[in-house]
Amino acid sequence: MRKTICSAACFCLLLVFAINAEEVRVETPANIQETIDDVLRDFYNKYSLPGGISMAISYREKLVYAGAIGYADKDHKIPLTPEHRMRIASLSKPITSIAVMKLVEEKKLHLHDEVFGDTGIFDGKYGIPEYENDSVKITVKQLLEHTAGGWGNSRRDPMFSVRNVTGDEFIRTVVKEYPLENSPGTKYDYSNFGYCVLGRVIEKKSGMSYEDYVKTHILKPCGIDGMRIGGKTSEPDEVEYIGVSGQNPYSVSPLHMDAHGGWVANPIELLKLLVRVDGFSNVPDILESETIKTMTTPSAQNNGYALGWSVNRSNNWWHTGSLPGTSTEMARSSSGFNWVILVNFRPGSAPEFSGDLDRLFWTIRTAIQEWHTGTEL
């Protein structure tokens, strides 16, 4: 049901969330809260979600909504709240991109640095990739753009097909046994493995673990203390993940997927990060404006993808994520709205699910014509 909301009408609903041991007070007019809750509830009911859906929205870099429908743990009847953390899957890729761009600003890294081979970032540690029996050079920028030439979703994704090896041996095995399908820099092919390698680039150039560098240099300046790389089990502040069609959410290891799909967060935390890399002026960004412009400029091989972000001609940036038991979206729009949606469920067969998830905010935007001031993030 669509409604037109006027910000002058009605009282405010005060919600207080304890995020990172600090209270986030969200004052949302009750009719706006009800309208958004109704949109989320319609989605929840349409797909008979066995878990729940949480969402946070900012306007002009202030929090205007944080809410959730459904369960964090249905078996124990624990309601979902925006405080509950979830695996965010590929929303981890923009986080990794932000970390790489911070290293570029620190002059510890260049986008055109070669990654493999004796003269590369790893000093030949992992060998060198081959294309048609010839050694090739892959750059940091190509990994960010998914144009490295191989290891993509269109064929075999080595992140999920190479088993029983981890760490350095895992990367060495992939480079040796998975020759490239294309010359680097010539074709887009979405690659989880490429972002796994970027995590190791961050470690090499920073002298810190990937997780520690991101926490110290990206999240802490945003006032975020609770995000982490997940594990095979759920922590007390984390939801239970629900698998369908024989999928076991706890068979995947977020630790192995750290830089491409391993982070655990709640929607307010992600929004706090997003408003500090969105290029708007109300909240200071943690990256310089030219760095953000570079990060969100589409590649020559795919005008819909930049460096870790999907982009379009409307100057909107976003990313989606999907794992067994997880569906996610994070977006920045040129109109001043940012939003994060997290679901602790992924359907086995529902081709319209991701499209409906993406349309949630636009349905809300159509229903609400005027917005209140919001709360500092």
Model-based region annotation:
Residues 55, 60-62, 87-110, 114-115, ...:
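Alpha-helical scaffold elements that line and support the substrate/ligand-binding pocket
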Residues 130-132, 154-235, 261-271:
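Catalytic-site signature segments of enzymes, centered on catalytic residues
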Residues 1-9:
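Bacterial N-terminal signal peptides that target proteins for export
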Residues 22-68, 203, 220, 248-377:
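Catalytic loop of the DD-peptidase/beta-lactamase superfamily, centered on the K-T-G motif
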Residues 47-54, 76-142, 182-191, 258-261, ...:
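Short active-site loop at a secondary-structure junction
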Residues 75, 170-181, 241-255:
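The feature captures the short pre-catalytic strand/loop hairpin that immediately precedes
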Residues 87-90, 105-151, 204-244:
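Active-site helix/loop module of the DD-peptidase/beta-lactamase fold
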Residues 8-16:
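Bacterial N-terminal signal peptides
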